[in-house]
Amino acid sequence: MAADGIDERSPLISPSSGNVTPTAPPYLQQNNLQAELPPPYTAIASPDASGVPVINCRVCQSLINLDGKLHQHVVKCTVCNEATPIKTPPLGKKYVRCPCNCLLICKDISRRIGCPRPNCRRIINLGPVMLIPEEQPAQPALPVQPEGTRVVCGHCGNTFLWMELRFNTLAKCPHCKKMNCQVPRIQGKNGSAPGKAFRSSVGSALPRRRCCTYITMGMICIFIGVGLTVGTQDFARRFHATYVSWAVAYLVGLVCLIRACYWGAIKFSYPEHSFA
């Protein structure tokens, strides 16, 4: 269950604990996310045996039998297969409930956390958590305005959060470690999704402009090198240091042409969701 050595982005209930997938319906998208604290519970008489401690599931409100599980930090509901905390998190940690009902654990100073479920992959923006006594029900965290943009990598297709709100900038994908040029997504007619014909000319202006600039600089340097080679042949026979100027001109021109090829072949990343 929850421990200090567990990855903060992994769910507290591992897939190996059961082959049944969560059946609780996902929450609707909420403006404020709730920082999970263990709810207060009391030992309630069970219909089968008296004195057996139980607790209500935080997702479906079903009763969870705590017999033999009081040493754990979280317990798994047998109805919706979601986790419910029964103890305070480890020192320096806090619980966070994703809108898809996945219970996560992260550092108490964390501002963002990603949901590891393949069908969710939300980037959760966290606010400062209010100190709440254990005898009171959990309260929602202070609202924090999300920042940044979720973009789709043009190389691997994965989504990542990019904090630069301006377009025409280079974004490095944390998954494949490749560079993308971030461009705005433009809708087609009648609100349809953009195709190749609707790619933003404003967004692609940065790589095109830099590609043309490097081509121009490369050709100028090569022409200068050719001019030096033709015009200073006799002078170079007496002063061999002239060959260095030839090599520098050709080398700079070659580097500029290589950079032009890089900017001409760079791929674009389109925003998935933008936050003001």
Swiss-Prot record:
Range of residues in the leader sequence: none
* Matching Pfam families: Tmemb_55A
**Composition bias type Polar residues, residue spans:** 13-27
The main location is membrane
- Membrane spanning segments where? 211-231, 246-266
One biological process term from GO is:
phosphatidylinositol dephosphorylation
Claim: Transmembrane helix is one of the keywords in the record: yes
Fetch the InterPro entries from UniProt: PtdIns-P2-Ptase
**GO annotation, cellular component aspect:** late endosome membrane; lysosomal membrane
Q: Which reaction does it catalyse?
A: a 1,2-diacyl-sn-glycero-3-phospho-(1D-myo-inositol-4,5-bisphosphate) + H2O = a 1,2-diacyl-sn-glycero-3-phospho-(1D-myo-inositol-5-phosphate) + phosphate
Active site per UniProt: 106
Q: Give residue numbers for sequence motif CX5R motif.
A: 106-112
Where is the protein localized? Answer: Late endosome membrane; Lysosome membrane
**What exactly does this protein do?**
Catalyzes the hydrolysis of phosphatidylinositol-4,5-bisphosphate (PtdIns-4,5-P2) to phosphatidylinositol-4-phosphate (PtdIns-4-P).
Protein name per UniProt: Type 2 phosphatidylinositol 4,5-bisphosphate 4-phosphatase
Q: What organism does the record attribute this protein to?
A: Xenopus tropicalis
**Taxonomic lineage of the native organism:** Eukaryota, Metazoa, Chordata, Craniata, Vertebrata
Q: Gene encoding it?
A: pip4p2
